[in-house]
Design a protein with these regions (language model features):
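C-terminal amphipathic helix plus adjacent low-complexity
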Residues: 235, 341-432
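Conserved catalytic-core segment of nucleotide-activated headgroup transferases in glycan assembly
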Residues: 20-22, 26-27, 35, 158-277
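Donor nucleotide-sugar binding/catalytic pocket of nucleotide-sugar-dependent glycosyltransferases
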Residues: 115-175
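N-terminal pre-catalytic "stem/leader" segment of glycosyltransferase-like enzymes
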Residues: 1-71, 217, 228, 395-398, ...
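Extended catalytic core of nucleotide-activated donor transferases of GT-like folds
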Residues: 6-8, 45-128
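Short alpha-helical segment that forms part of, or immediately flanks, the ligand-binding pocket
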Residues: 276, 301-309, 316-320
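Acidic donor-binding loop of glycosyltransferase active sites
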Residues: 277-295, 305-308
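Short hydrophobic beta-strand element within catalytic cores of glycosyltransferases
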Residues: 309-312, 326-327
């Protein structure tokens, strides 16, 4: 009989945590060692329609009614302040933190688990380096810090889903909807920026989408020939109101510039196949990210498979895998009060700020010297597909289970003591 494992996470949501949850769950299923049940949770306001007919391997395991017995292994994918013990052995998996500090509730949550798994060295270091003092009568009586083991397991790229489509193959392999939409763009050179446009004043939302748009406009406004930007973004929903709000935000920035370059908003749900077609469309030449911080940076990893160059900040989680890119300089500084998120992004923490003047030049160089810059994309594609793919992640996950998760009694080797050989006396019948 296989040991019982409960996997709890946002497996049905269209979110970064949802993507990661599905990858991890499939990795555990492939181990073929556990009787698995899944508790599917919401993730903010993100849609819960990510599981389709081809995802029966996951949907068939989702528990819908009644109580479940306490499992041998409990795996929870969430933010650490929500971590709870429900099994004999408990694993908490989180994307970690994009800043330099975590809230004390995160530390307490990590200490409730037996093992904590994060996707990057940055996330691990932030958890282990955040220390709070416990005070009593004005004196420090103890320290609050993570005492449980923290291991890094990167978010592997599914190279069967994300892969390079050569220009001459795009007509055959590219998604028709994406092709039709982007073919109408008159510009032949487009930068791609993607990610949720989160809370924060201008320049202080976590992805710094506003700052990137402004820098792009500064770089190319007034030029007779200029590139465009494709912006794939939303708040957390794909509603009409959300779309109109995104359009207004973009126009509010462009209005400050005369003859600004075009910015095309891509808003709404995309399948993985559509996203890969977006990355590979011949008009999309480069991805750009001014992100203040990433726990990992999954879109940057997935875009790498296209073989096209990336312009990005060089701080936090994506440093692990983004070896060949245009690295934007800047400095680490205090987060703005408008970006504070209760018990998640705390006011005492810091993150990265791009040097906009340097970034403006980087955008201009990517446009004017693209032939030279393409070599970065080719090198990065080779690096990501050989070191950070899904199969390599699966292998490491198996190693973590073998290292930390106690084996069931049925799998344990029984070491019996050895005895010297013994000679038994010869028995004789009575009377002989």
């Amino acid at each position: 009989m296989k040991p019982f494992l409960i996997f709890q996470g946002p497996v049905a949501t269209r979110s970064g945590y949802g993507d990661h949850s599905r990858d991890l769950l499939r990795s555990i299923i492939a181990m073929n060692k556990y009787d698995i049940k899944v508790i599917s949770l919401r993730w903010g306001n993100t849609p819960m329609n990510a599981l389709g007919p081809d995802d029966s391997d996951i949907s068939s395991l989702i528990h819908t009614q009644g109580n479940l017995p306490s499992p041998d292994v409990f795996v929870q994918v969430s933010v650490p302040n929500e971590f709870q013990r429900h099994g004999k052995y408990n694993i908490g998996i989180t994307a970690g933190m994009e800043t330099t500090l975590v809230h004390q509730d995160w530390i307490e949550g990590c200490n409730r688990m037996d093992l904590v798994v994060v996707p990057s060295e940055h996330a691990k270091n932030v958890l282990l380096n955040t220390v709070y003092s416990k005070m009593q009568d004005g004196k420090e009586v103890d320290k609050l810090l993570v005492k449980k083991p923290v291991e890094v397991l990167f978010e592997g790229v599914d190279t069967d889903t994300y892969f390079e489509i050569k220009k001459h193959d795009y007509q055959k392999l590219g998604d028709a909807t994406i092709k039709e939409s982007l073919d109408t763009i008159p510009e032949d050179f487009c930068f791609l920026q993607m990610g949720h446009w989160l809370q924060g004043d201008h320049g202080h939302d976590r992805k710094d989408i506003g700052g990137c748009i402004e820098t792009f406009c500064k770089a190319f406004s007034g030029r007779s020939k200029k590139p465009a930007m494709i912006l794939k973004t939303s708040h957390a929903t794909f509603s009409i109101l959300d779309r109109e709000d995104m359009i207004q935000k973009v126009e509010n920035i462009r209005a400050h510039f005369k003859d600004a370059p075009n910015i095309y908003l891509l808003h709404g749900e995309l399948t993985d196949s559509e996203v890969n077609s977006l990355y590979n469309h011949p008009k999309v030449k480069s991805m750009v990210s001014f992100t203040h911080g990433e726990g990992y940076g999954r879109p940057l990893a997935e875009f790498s498979t296209s073989g096209k160059p990336i312009i990005s900040t060089w701080w936090s989680g994506h440093k692990d895998f983004l070896k060949h890119s245009v690295r934007l300089v800047g400095q680490v500084g205090q987060i703005h009060e408008s970006a504070v998120w209760d018990k998640v992004i705390i006011p005492e923490s810091q993150w990265f700020y791009v040097n906009y003047k340097f970034a403006q030049k980087a955008l201009q160089d990517m446009y004017s010297k693209y032939t030279k810059q393409k070599e970065l994309g080719r090198r990065q594609k080779y690096y990501i597909t050989n070191n950070f793919d899904l199969k390599t992640m699966d292998k490491k996950f198996v190693e973590l289970f073998s290292k930390y998760v106690p084996k069931p009694v049925s799998e344990m080797a029984l070491d019996l003591p050895s005895f010297d050989s013994m000679e038994l006396p010869t028995l004789q019948k009575a009377g002989e």
